[in-house]
Amino acid sequence: MSSHQPRKRFGQHFLHERGIIQRIVAAFDPKPTDHVVEIGPGEGVLTRELVGKVARLDVVEIDRDLIARLRESLPEAVTIHSADALKFDFCALAPHTDVPVSRETGSRERPPSHGKLRVIGNLPYNISTPLLFHLLDQAHCVSDMLFMLQKEVVDRMVAAPGGKDYGRL
């Protein structure tokens, strides 16, 4: 795939370094039963590392040029969603019909990871914080998330009150 010119309005920055990509995948530890959603696959380098390692792989991309390239280069097993991750209903991807009814309570109770999504992404700086809050609203559908974030975002998240990096997220 030829290189795509990152678009500033989408805050795009792409992963290229093979060693870093392998470390990300190792930290994520994908399992053959996982349903993974990747936010902002970009040129698909992380996506390609996940193909064949998980049961289902969905990607959410807003850039139409990248979507066209991804459709040409990724296997059909990857479902590509042309959407803004800030407005995307991640829970719509999580299965809800196969949850057994509890004998004790009579309600549908989902075991800790049953039917939940695993979310991964190299998040753009300009939407990192609102996207994290959007995903927290849908946390009941997600078992875990692993994101690459710009250092400034992480510094602000872990800053102590009164510190130079402390401020509203």
PLM feature segments, named:
Residues 1-98, 113-169:
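Catalytic cores of RNA-modifying enzymes
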Residues 99-104, 110-112:
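Short, low-complexity intrinsically disordered segments enriched in A/P/G/S/L with frequent Arg
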Residues 104-105, 117:
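Residue-level detector of alpha-helical transmembrane segments in integral membrane proteins
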